[in-house]
Amino acid sequence: MNKQPEDWLDDVPENKNDDDDEIIWVSKSEIKRDAEALKDLGTELVDLGKNALERIPLDEDLLAAIELAQKIKKEGRRRQLQLIGKMLRARDVEPIQTALDKLKNRHNQQISLFHKLETLRDRLIAEGDEAIPTVLELYPDADRQQLRSLVRNAQKEQAANKPPKSFRQIFSYLRELAEKKQ
């Protein structure tokens, strides 16, 4: 029996749109980029200190490999980093990446807090007693008397061109208040 060109479609089974059977094609370049990203993540982990590593959810094998890479130099380190990248490919890296991002974010938040405290200190010295209620709103535990004394001393030092001792004391006092609040 000779089939017509349209008849060959009758022999092909219909696609039932099964998403489970669908094969997702990934290019070799994308696989390499993913592997390189995991290797970079491993490098970031190796560059962290011991205290920071304790805050990241790592299993014993991966932690041992990271600690070994921290001790190794030159070519051995490169090979160890490749091994760490390979180990990361076999694991769920999302919790590790999240913890690492939190560590980086904490550092950025601390820098941002210091900038805010410096601005507040400068405002206290420039405006004097008028800016103290702002500090008391932000930090209810603040001692008004001590703050007024520090501001007055800083203004006197600034007028006399003396070293900024009270200037630094205001900042450290504000930093203590911010740490208590957190």
UniProtKB/Swiss-Prot annotation:
Q: Name one GO molecular function term.
A: rRNA binding
On whether Disulfide bond is a keyword of this UniProt record, the answer is: no
Output the Gene Ontology cellular-component terms.
cytosol
Q: Does the keyword RNA-binding apply?
A: yes
The name this protein goes by in its record: Dual-action ribosomal maturation protein DarP
Q: Which GO BP terms, alphabetically?
A: assembly of large subunit precursor of preribosome
Q: Please state where this protein is localized.
A: Cytoplasm
